[in-house]
Design a protein with these regions (language model features):
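Juxtamembrane helix-loop-helix connectors linking adjacent transmembrane helices
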Residues: 1-66, 84, 153-156
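Hydrophobic, lipid-facing residues on alpha-helical transmembrane segments of integral membrane proteins
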Residues: 9-25, 29, 64, 68, ...
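Membrane-embedded glycan transfer/ligation machinery
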Residues: 23, 62, 75-79, 95, ...
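Short helix-coil transition sites and intra-membrane helix breaks within transmembrane domains
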Residues: 66-71, 105-109
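Membrane-interface helix/loop boundary segments of multi-pass membrane proteins
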Residues: 69-94, 124-128
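Functionally important transmembrane alpha-helices
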Residues: 89-156
Length: 156
C-alpha cells in the first residue's frame, strides 16, 4: 500500500466536486427533456413512509453490506482482471462503466460511473480495496442519512 499524500486528498475532493457537478447537470438535462427517470434513492424516499422498518434495514444493507460486496467484486476481481488484458486507464474506465450499469439506475448512471472511476483510481493508486471501501461507505452513508432525515420530517 502506498503512503498517504495530501495531494491525493485534494484529488478526492476534486472528484467529489465533479460528482456534484455531474449530478446537477444530469438532473437538469433529465428535467429539461422531461424524462421521468427516478434514482434508486428517490424510490426509497417514496416508499420510506409506507414501510419505515423495511427502509431502515435496506439502508443498513446499502451502507455496510453493499459497499463491501461491491468493492470485493468490482475492485477486487473485475478491475485486476481487466488490467491483465487492458492498459490501466482502460481498465479503470471499463470497470467504472460496468459498475455504473450494474446498479440498474439510469437516473444516476453518470454519477455512478464517476463514483466507479474514483473507486477504481483509488484501488490502482493504493493497491488496496480499503480506501475505496471507506469512501463507498461514506458515500452511501450520506445518502442514507438524507433518507433518514426525510423519514423523520427534517427534510421535505
Amino acid at each position: 500500500m502506498r503512503r498517504f499524500r495530501p495531494l491525493f486528498l485534494w484529488l478526492v475532493i476534486a472528484f467529489l466536486a465533479l460528482l456534484y457537478v455531474v449530478n446537477s447537470l444530469y438532473s437538469a438535462l433529465l428535467e429539461g427533456l422531461h424524462l421521468p427517470l427516478q434514482t434508486n434513492d428517490q424510490v426509497i424516499l417514496e416508499s420510506s413512509r409506507l414501510a419505515p422498518l423495511t427502509t431502515i434495514v435496506l439502508l443498513v444493507l446499502a451502507v455496510i453490506v453493499a459497499p463491501l460486496c461491491e468493492e470485493i467484486f468490482f475492485r477486487g476481481f473485475v478491475f485486476p482482471g481487466l488490467r491483465r488484458g487492458l492498459a490501466t486507464g482502460w481498465a479503470i474506465v471499463v470497470s467504472a462503466l460496468v459498475f455504473g450499469l450494474a446498479h440498474a439506475d439510469l437516473g444516476s448512471l453518470p454519477v455512478l460511473i464517476v463514483i466507479g472511476l474514483l473507486l477504481a483510481l483509488l484501488r490502482w493508486w493504493s493497491g488496496s480495496i480499503y480506501p475505496g471501501l471507506l469512501l463507498h461507505i461514506l458515500n452511501n452513508g450520506i445518502s442514507a442519512a438524507v433518507i433518514l432525515l426525510y423519514m423523520v420530517g427534517r427534510l421535505h
